[in-house]
């Protein structure tokens, strides 16, 4: 009788879908109110003037204007602001 042993199992073979995080509008770009500026987990970038933070830490513009990135404070946190025209 011909026999073939059972193939072994594996714990690999899975991968999660990418979340498309990161900066969506860069410094100097003109944006409209409501535009998403940064998608992030945690506060790598903090909201500055005319920018608010959503419940998933997404930063979005509250006014039309130009995007500005700056490092401020004792710990040099990165802030995203909107400069209105």
Curated annotation (Swiss-Prot):
Highest classification ranks of the organism: Bacteria, Pseudomonadati, Pseudomonadota, Gammaproteobacteria, Candidatus Pseudothioglobaceae
Family (UniProt): Belongs to the bacterial ribosomal protein bL27 family.
InterPro entries: Ribosomal_bL27 (IPR001684), Ribosomal_bL27_CS (IPR018261)
Ribonucleoprotein recorded as keyword: yes
Ranges in coiled-coil conformation: none
Classification via Gene3D superfamilies: 2.40.50.100
A single GO BP: translation
GO cellular component: cytosolic large ribosomal subunit
UniProt keyword terms in alphabetical order: Ribonucleoprotein, Ribosomal protein
Species assigned in the record: Ruthia magnifica subsp. Calyptogena magnifica
GO molecular function, one term: structural constituent of ribosome
Matches recorded under Pfam families: Ribosomal_L27
Primary gene name: rpmA
The name this protein goes by in its record: Large ribosomal subunit protein bL27
């Amino acid at each position: 009788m011909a026999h073939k042993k059972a193939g072994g199992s594996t714990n690999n073979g899975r991968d999660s879908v990418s979340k498309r995080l990161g900066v969506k509008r860069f410094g100097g770009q003109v944006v409209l109110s409501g535009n998403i500026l940064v998608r992030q987990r945690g506060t790598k970038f903090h909201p500055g003037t005319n920018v608010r933070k959503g419940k998933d830490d997404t930063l979005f513009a509250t006014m039309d204007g130009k995007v500005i990135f700056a490092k401020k404070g004792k710990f040099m946190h990165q802030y995203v602001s909107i400069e209105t025209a």
